[in-house]
C-alpha cells in the first residue's frame, strides 16, 4: 500500500460526503469528471454516451438483501484510432456512504461480471464492462471466433485482462472527479473473484498490478489451456480403459475415500482436511467389493465442472449444463471402477510416462467422469463435459462447435498436444501464469489467494503450483525461511479443507471463509496483516464453528476435537509438488 495519512484520507472523504447525492449524480458532473483525451494513453472517452441516474433503495451484489442509494452511471470509450466502442457501467455510492474505495468483481465461466453494484457494501464505487463485445449479453465463448479458423483476438485480449484493467483505470479517475477529490487523492482499489473470476483477478495482479491495493482470488482458472483440456481427461481415461462406470459407483468410491481418510487429520468430522495424508496412506483398491445403491432420478451437469456448493458472483454458472435420466443403480465397486478413479487422480501423462498435468486431490468428486445412461442399450456411455470439449473445438480446432462429438482416435498424447497448442497460442492472453509480480508487490499490493482443497473442477494443486512458481521466480536467491517471510507480507495462500469449487461441499461439511473483503480492507488500510484465515462451518455436527485456517505451506493437524495446529510436513508438501516434463517449456 502506498503510504497515505489516515487523517488526509478522512479529510478527503469528509469533503466528498459534503456534496449532496442529487448534486453529483448528474450527466454534467460525470462528463466533467471524464479524463480528457490523451490523459490515459490509448483511451478516448465518448462524452455523448454518458448517462447518470439516481437509484434509491436498490438491492446490490449477489444474494444481498441490503438496499442502497447509488448513482447508476454509464460511460463509453474507444481505443484511440481503432473505431471500436466499449461500454462501462459504474455504481457510485451516495456521497455520505463513499469511503474512498473502488471495487472490481470477477465473473465466472466465459463471462465477465455484469453487476457493478458489488462494491456498495464496502462504500466503494464498482464497475462492469461490456469489453467491446457486448459482454453484458454475450459470453466470450460465443464471440471468440469470427468464423471457422478466425480468432477474434480483440475479444480475447479484452476478456483475458485488458477490459478490467481499463475499466479500473478509467473508473478511479472518474471517481475522484465525481466526488470532487484532488487528482492525487487516494482511492483504495480492490478485486474479488473466484473460478474464472479468480483467473481474472490474477490477470489484474500480473498485468495491472500498480492499479490495485488488494486482490482476493479464489480457485483461479489460470494455466487456461491445461485446465480446460483437463476437463476432457476423465472421459479419455474411461475410453482408454474401456470402462464407463455407473455414476453411483464413482460416488461410492469418493464417499468411501472420504470416510477412510477423514480421521487422518486428527478429527473425525466428515472432512478430509489433509488430502496429502490420504494420498500417501490410502489405497483405493481397499474399496473394491463394497456395495452401492442409488435410486432412479435425473442428473444435472452444472456446467464448468461446478459441484453442488454455494458460488459467488457467477453470471452464467450453469453454462453448458445438461439434464439426463438415471435408472436405479445397484452393485459393488469393481476393480475397473477403481482403476478409472485412480488414473484420474494420478493425472495426465503422455505415452512416454512423462507427466503433463496435475489432477484433483483424492477424495474430490469425480464430476467430469460422470457417464450418461443410454436407455436403448441399457448401458452407461461416454459423456464428454462441454467445459473441456468446447475449448477444444473452438479454441484449438477453431471450429464453431459447442462440444466434441466423440473421442475417436484421441489418446493421452492428443490431450497433451491440445494443451501445448493452447498454451502457445494463448500464452500472452488467457494462460495467465506470469510469476513475477514485482510491480504489484513493489507498489504495496496485497494478495489473498484461496482454493477449496477438494475442488472437483479446478485442482487445488494448480494454485499450489503457481504459488511455488512465484516464490521461485521472485525469491529464488533466498533461503526457504526468508522466502516465506517475504511472501507472507503481501501474498498469502490458503487451502480450504473439504471445500469444493468456490464454495462449500455437499459431501464434506467443512469451513468456508465468509469475510475475506473485511480482512483485506483491514490489511490494506490499517496494516493488520492476517496470519490465518477466518472460516465458518455451515453444516454438519460442527455447524457454527469458527476455524482459523492455516496459511500455506503449513498444514492442519487436529489435537482432539476442539483445536488444530498448523504444522510443517515436508513429505506432505512434496506430494503437492509437480514438474511437467511432457512440455519443452516451463509451465508456471
From Swiss-Prot:
Enzyme Commission number(s) of this protein: 3.1.1.20
Residues with PTM Pyrrolidone carboxylic acid: 317
Disulfides per UniProt: 25-71, 194-502, 261-278
Changes after translation: The protein is glycosylated to a carbohydrate content of 22.7%. The N-terminus of the 30 kDa subunit is blocked.
InterPro entries in UniProt: AB_hydrolase_fold, Tannase/feruloyl_esterase
Chemical reaction(s) catalysed: digallate + H2O = 2 3,4,5-trihydroxybenzoate + H(+)
Assembly and oligomerization: Heterooctamer of 4 33 kDa and 4 30 kDa subunits linked by disulfide bond(s).
Protein name according to UniProt: Tannase
Taxonomy of the source species: Eukaryota, Fungi, Dikarya, Ascomycota, Pezizomycotina
Amino acid at each position: 500500500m502506498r503510504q497515505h495519512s489516515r487523517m488526509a484520507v478522512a479529510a478527503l472523504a469528509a469533503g466528498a460526503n459534503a456534496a449532496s447525492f442529487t448534486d453529483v449524480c448528474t450527466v454534467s458532473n460525470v462528463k466533467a469528471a471524464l479524463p480528457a483525451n490523451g490523459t490515459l494513453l490509448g483511451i478516448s472517452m465518448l462524452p455523448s454516451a454518458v448517462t447518470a441516474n439516481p437509484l434509491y433503495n436498490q438491492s446490490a451484489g449477489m444474494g444481498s438483501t441490503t438496499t442502497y442509494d447509488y448513482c447508476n452511471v454509464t460511460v463509453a470509450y474507444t481505443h484511440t484510432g481503432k473505431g471500436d466502442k466499449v461500454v462501462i457501467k459504474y455504481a457510485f455510492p451516495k456521497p455520505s456512504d463513499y469511503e474512498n474505495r473502488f471495487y472490481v468483481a470477477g465473473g465466472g465461466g466465459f463471462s465477465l461480471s455484469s453487476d457493478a453494484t458489488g462494491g456498495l457494501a464496502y462504500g466503494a464505487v464498482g464497475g462492469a464492462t461490456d469489453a467491446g463485445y457486448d459482454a453484458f449479453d454475450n459470453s466470450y465463448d460465443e464471440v471468440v471466433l469470427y468464423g471457422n479458423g478466425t480468432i477474434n483476438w480483440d475479444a480475447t485480449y479484452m476478456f483475458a485482462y485488458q477490459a478490467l484493467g481499463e475499466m479500473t483505470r478509467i473508473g478511479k479517475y472518474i471517481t475522484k472527479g465525481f466526488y470532487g477529490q484532488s487528482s492525487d487523492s487516494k482511492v483504495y482499489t480492490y478485486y474479488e473473484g473466484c473460478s474464472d473470476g479468480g483467473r481474472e483477478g490474477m490477470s489484474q495482479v500480473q498485468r495491472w498490478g500498480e492499479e490495485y491495493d488488494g486482490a482476493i482470488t479464489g480457485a483461479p482458472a489460470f494455466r487456461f489451456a491445461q485446465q480446460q483440456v483437463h476437463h476432457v481427461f476423465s472421459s479419455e481415461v474411461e475410453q482408454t480403459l474401456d470402462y464407463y462406470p455407473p455414476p453411483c459407483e464413482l460416488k461410492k468410491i469418493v464417499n468411501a475415500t472420504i470416510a477412510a481418510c477423514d480421521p487422518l487429520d486428527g478429527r473425525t468430522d466428515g472432512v478430509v482436511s489433509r488430502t496429502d495424508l490420504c494420498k500417501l496412506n490410502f489405497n483405493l483398491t481397499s474399496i473394491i467389493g463394497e456395495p452401492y445403491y442409488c435410486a432412479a432420478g435425473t442428473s444435472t451437469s452444472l456446467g464448468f465442472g461446478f459441484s453442488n456448493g454455494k458460488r459467488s458472483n457467477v453470471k452464467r454458472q450453469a453454462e453448458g449444463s445438461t439434464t439426463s435420466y438415471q435408472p436405479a443403480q445397484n452393485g459393488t465397486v469393481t476393480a475397473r471402477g477403481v482403476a478409472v478413479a485412480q488414473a484420474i487422480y494420478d493425472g495426465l501423462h503422455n505415452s512416454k510416462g512423462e507427466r503433463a498435468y496435475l489432477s484433483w486431490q483424492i477424495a474430490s468428486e469425480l464430476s467430469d467422469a460422470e457417464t450418461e445412461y443410454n436407455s436403448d442399450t441399457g448401458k452407461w456411455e461416454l459423456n464428454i463435459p462441454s467445459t473441456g470439449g468446447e475449448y477444444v473445438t473452438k479454441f484449438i480446432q477453431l471450429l464453431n462447435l459447442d462440444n466434441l462429438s466423440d473421442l475417436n482416435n484421441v489418446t493421452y498424447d492428443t490431450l497433451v498436444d491440445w494443451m501445448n497448442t493452447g498454451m502457445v497460442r494463448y500464452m500472452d492472453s488467457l494462460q495467465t501464469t506470469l510469476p513475477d509480480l514485482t510491480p504489484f508487490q513493489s507498489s504495496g499490493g496485497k494478495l489473498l489467494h484461496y482454493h477449496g482443497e477438494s475442488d472437483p473442477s479446478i485442482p487445488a494443486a494448480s494454485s499450489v503450483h503457481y504459488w511455488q512458481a512465484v516464490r521461485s521466480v521472485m525469491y529464488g536467491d533466498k533461503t526457504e525461511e526468508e522466502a516465506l517471510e517475504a511472501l507472507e507480507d503481501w501474498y498469502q495462500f490458503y487451502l480450504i479443507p473439504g471445500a469444493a469449487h468456490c464454495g462449500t461441499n455437499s459431501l464434506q461439511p467443512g469451513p468456508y471463509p465468509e469475510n475475506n473483503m473485511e480482512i483485506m480492507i483491514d490489511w490494506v488500510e490499517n496494516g493488520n496483516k492476517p496470519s490465518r484465515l477466518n472460516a465458518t462451518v455451515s453444516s454438519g455436527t460442527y455447524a457454527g464453528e469458527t476455524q482459523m485456517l492455516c496459511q500455506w505451506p503449513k498444514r492442519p493437524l487436529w489435537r482432539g476435537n476442539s483445536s488444530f495446529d498448523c504444522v510443517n510436513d515436508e513429505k506432505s508438501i512434496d506430494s503437492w509438488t509437480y514438474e511437467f516434463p511432457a512440455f519443452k517449456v516451463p509451465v508456471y
